Amino acid sequence: MNVSIFEDVIKDVDCYVDNILQEGFEDVQVGNDLFRNVKARGVDELVSFLNKNYPTYRPDLNFVRRSPINQEEPNWIHTDEMMGDLTAILYLSKKHPKEDGTTLYYKGEKMCIFKSRYNRLVVFPSKLYHSRNIYDNFGYAESARLIQVCFLKNNI
């Protein structure tokens, strides 16, 4: 299993986040699951970074998600296996609880805990079970948890 952590991925992250917030968010129904406060992104600075650092993969789905406190989420501990081969999560909350981040699991046990940091990117195999560290999310409106997720598929 290969896991990667990158710091300071987006050059002008404050402007990047401002643009995301200005575009707004929407709710998307996928089968029985309702994904709240998401917004699809096209080819952006994160995708360019991933293309450069993962040349044998192609970004398939790229979106941002804002998760205010007590927002119902369709999944807790889950895999993204059906979405791609790698999952990339970019933390975009400038202010966040120290517990914020992502936990990876192996055979039902916590294996690795990533701590959120503004403009930090974590990339891991999509088949791994994982969850956000704070079940109920945090913040309100512009202070809510903000992440960008991109799924990558192997070109080979």
For the regions a protein language model found, what residue spans apply to each?
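Catalytic core of non-heme Fe(II) oxygenases with the double-stranded beta-helix
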Residues: 68-156
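Non-heme Fe(II)/2-oxoglutarate
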Residues: 1-75
